[in-house]
């Protein structure tokens, strides 16, 4: 398709999202991450293996995604997301996928997706659990992430994989559900709000 999807975070959620969207023939993917691949990532980040250790996630992800589908255009953003750089890139994409692991980033992604009226799929995982929210901000009456979480009551330790741990299959399931929500929207199928 000609759809453009921006994936923020090439970790346990972003990897399966990118892989399944690429396999599905998405026209354009943007991937944002500033991190390098570490051994502790391998069990939940399906695009990476031991040969990729210490390399930049976005560069390796682009290479592997191009091997899956060379027709998908992939643009990489190898930096930590902030308000300034996110405002510059969000306008070019139809769909925003939040695969981050901290609420500061999640709220920033939420706020700018709302401001620019984007379709946002946000996901989170911890231990054996995960969830996704699908927000179509083109609809002015749509709630946002802040409606469900009060910023002052949240600790980033809730989403910290190093602190809490994560079962790798949970990341794959939640990331696949995020990809599924994007595909359903592109195909004009009914949306699930979980």
Model-derived segments and spans:
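Adenine nucleotide-associated cytosolic modules
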Residues: 1-192
């Amino acid at each position: 398709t000609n759809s453009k999807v921006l994936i923020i975070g090439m970790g346990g959620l972003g990897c399966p999202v990118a892989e399944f969207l690429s396999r599905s023939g998405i026209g354009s993917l943007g991937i944002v991450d500033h991190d390098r691949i570490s051994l502790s990532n391998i069990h939940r980040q399906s695009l990476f293996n031991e040969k990729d250790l210490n390399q930049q996630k976005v560069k390796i992800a682009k290479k592997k995604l191009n091997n899956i589908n060379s027709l998908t255009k992939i643009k990489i953003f190898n930096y930590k997301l902030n308000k300034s750089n996110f405002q510059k890139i969000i306008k070019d994409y139809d769909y925003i996928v939040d695969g981050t692991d901290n609420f500061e980033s999640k709220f920033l992604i939420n706020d700018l997706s709302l401001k620019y009226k984007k379709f946002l799929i946000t996901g989170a995982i911890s231990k054996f659990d995960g969830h996704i929210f699908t927000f179509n901000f083109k609809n002015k009456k749509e709630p946002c992430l802040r409606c469900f979480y009060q910023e002052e009551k949240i600790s980033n330790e809730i989403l910290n994989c190093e602190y809490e741990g994560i079962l790798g299959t949970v990341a794959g399931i939640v990331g696949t559900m995020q990809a599924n929500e994007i595909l359903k929207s592109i195909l004009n199928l009914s949306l699930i709000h979980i």
